[in-house]
């Protein structure tokens, strides 16, 4: 063990061909003891149940557990664990809250899962500069609770109460993206432990400026890297003023086409909508049952507006007129916080509502994003393909920026149905690419969309990504098997 600890302090050492792995494929006892010496015995586990828990996310991808799970308490421990793994050729899998849906935490080659949830401090708040620095265990809800009396908030809202550093790692988005942008637009700086244990501050240590023309955009490189380039141990985020007033609304439509046409026209009219979400008839039926709503079972838009009382009245008037021109009905306002929260809770619980439609089934979720002008076309075609494939599925999405999700229900014991679901997801990704879009707007590539990534960015794009990966992670130890 002493030798392993000495090696962990070195920056470069000969490739050891997984010499720390025992003869049965797990980690050697000496290596496990070395991990305990870094983070403490209570913060290392090789128990089967713990490893299984950390070997999967919310996806249906066939996943493998790591060989060990560690809970570092600070960035120095993360650096030392990474260095130890790097020098011993052991794969590293960062873990936040495990709410991803593309198999991003699956340990395809075993290795060490670094659970970052014990690092849960908000280390700096700069209200005058509209920025905050958080550790990887801080979730979106925890941050906004902390900000409640500051007049500021962090709006990126993927639904699940994900960790903010995990959201940065996956390039997450959410219901507010149409107004406030995605994680790519709201991350100012990152602290990253590189695979060999070195510490990188992507915009410079302690910097939280709004813009810079200094060199390459290293922050942008790591946002959306899905744990394949390094371990994000801190993120500096852009905050926004909390809105003076908020109003939500719902409106039902006679068809998918009418609902999406309204979306496009609302955006073209420059209505500064904060959220505009589409739910198809299947999803509305599920939400009515699961969340005790009383909405028409029809294609529906959920909307939210932020601003002053005066501007909100104007926004609602213009939006209602547009929806009526497209056959919209049952236009309902929700001004009280309790009613708004009920509405958005139903939207965020769409995954569980869909699952309740078919007890015993598993849910498979996939997402794409297309230019707004092609959104009506792809949504109508996707709805038709779900029916043609004889699958049970719902469509829900952040249509204000062209992004939507399909939640498909699958019998886990029906191999043929699983094959049809996989074929549907691949067809949807290729349909989005054919329309000038992307195979994923916010879920990421993970395990399931690596082939589609190659089709999206082309051979030169993939090779450039591979060269970047090889430069930062020459031993291929950071979350192997993902993205590339």
Swiss-Prot record:
Its cofactor is FAD. Residues 1-52 form a transit peptide. InterPro entries: FAD-bd_oxidored_4_C, FAD-bd_PCMH, FAD-bd_PCMH-like_sf, FAD-bd_PCMH_sub1, FAD-bd_PCMH_sub2, FAD-linked_Oxase-like_C, Oxid_FAD_bind_N, Vanillyl_alc_oxidase_C-sub2. GO terms for molecular function: D-lactate dehydrogenase (cytochrome) activity; D-lactate dehydrogenase activity; FAD binding. Interacts with CSRP3. The modification N6-acetyllysine is found at residues 36, 292, 335, 422, 449. Belongs to the FAD-binding oxidoreductase/transferase type 4 family. It comes from the Eukaryota. Transmembrane segments: none annotated. Readily detected in liver and kidney, with a weaker signal observed in heart, skeletal muscle, stomach, brain, and lung. The keyword rRNA processing does not apply. Keywords: Acetylation, FAD, Flavoprotein, Mitochondrion, Oxidoreductase, Transit peptide. Pfam families: FAD-oxidase_C (PF02913), FAD_binding_4 (PF01565). The keyword Transit peptide applies. This is Probable D-lactate dehydrogenase, mitochondrial. GO terms for biological process: ATP biosynthetic process; lactate catabolic process. SUPFAM superfamilies: FAD-binding/transporter-associated domain-like, FAD-linked oxidases, C-terminal domain. It is found in: Mitochondrion. Involved in D-lactate, but not L-lactate catabolic process. Coiled coil: none annotated. The modification N6-succinyllysine is found at residue 335. Its EC number is 1.1.2.4. Residues 62-242 form the FAD-binding PCMH-type domain. It is an enzyme of class 1 (oxidoreductase). One of its GO terms (cellular component) is mitochondrial inner membrane.
């Amino acid at each position: 063990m002493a030798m392993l600890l000495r090696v962990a302090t070195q920056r470069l050492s000969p490739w050891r061909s997984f010499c720390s792995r025992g003869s049965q494929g797990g980690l050697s006892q000496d290596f496990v003891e070395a991990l305990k010496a870094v983070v403490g015995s209570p913060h290392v586990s090789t128990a089967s149940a713990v490893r299984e828990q950390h070997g999967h996310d919310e996806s249906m991808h066939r996943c493998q557990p790591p060989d060990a799970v560690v809970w570092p308490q600070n960035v120095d421990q993360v650096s030392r664990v990474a260095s130890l793994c790097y020098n011993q050729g052991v794969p590293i899998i960062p873990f936040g809250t495990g709410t991803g849906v593309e198999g991003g935490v699956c340990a395809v080659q075993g290795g060490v899962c670094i659970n970052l949830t014990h690092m849960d401090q908000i280390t700096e708040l700069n209200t005058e500069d509209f920025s905050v620095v958080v550790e990887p265990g801080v979730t979106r809800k925890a941050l906004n609770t902390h900000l409640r009396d500051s007049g500021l908030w962090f709006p990126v809202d993927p639904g699940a109460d994900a960790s903010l550093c995990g959201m940065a790692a996956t390039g997450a988005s959410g219901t507010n993206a149409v107004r406030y942008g995605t994680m790519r637009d709201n991350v100012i700086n990152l602290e990253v432990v590189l695979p060999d244990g070195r510490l990188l501050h992507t915009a410079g240590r302690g910097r939280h400026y709004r813009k810079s023309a200094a060199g390459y955009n290293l922050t942008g490189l790591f946002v959306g890297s899905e744990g394949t380039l390094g371990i994000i141990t801190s993120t500096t985020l852009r905050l926004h003023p909390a809105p003076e007033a908020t109003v939500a609304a719902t409106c039902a439509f006679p068809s998918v086409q009418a609902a999406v046409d309204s979306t496009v026209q609302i955006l073209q009219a420059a209505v500064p909508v904060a959220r505009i979400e589409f739910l198809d008839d299947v999803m509305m039926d599920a939400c009515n049952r699961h969340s005790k709503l009383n909405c028409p079972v029809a294609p529906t838009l959920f909307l939210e507006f932020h601003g002053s009382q005066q501007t909100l009245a104007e926004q609602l008037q213009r939006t209602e007129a547009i929806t009526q021109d497209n056959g919209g009905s049952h236009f309902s306002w929700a001004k009280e916080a309790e009613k708004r929260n009920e509405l958005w809770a139903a939207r965020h619980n769409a995954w569980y509502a869909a699952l309740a439609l078919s007890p015993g089934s598993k849910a498979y979720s996939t997402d794409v994003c297309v230019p707004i002008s092609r959104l009506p076309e792809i949504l109508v075609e996707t709805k038709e393909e779900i029916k043609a494939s004889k699958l049970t599925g719902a469509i829900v999405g952040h249509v204000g920026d062209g992004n939507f999700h399909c939640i498909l229900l699958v019998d886990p014991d029906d191999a043929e149905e699983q094959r049809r679901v996989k074929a549907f997801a691949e067809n949807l990704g290729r349909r989005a690419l054919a329309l000038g879009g992307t195979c994923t707007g916010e879920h990421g590539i993970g395990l399931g969309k690596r082939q589609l990534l190659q089709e999206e960015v082309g051979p030169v794009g993939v090779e450039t990504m591979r060269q970047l990966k090889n430069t930062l992670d020459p031993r291929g130890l950071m979350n192997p098997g993902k993205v590339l």
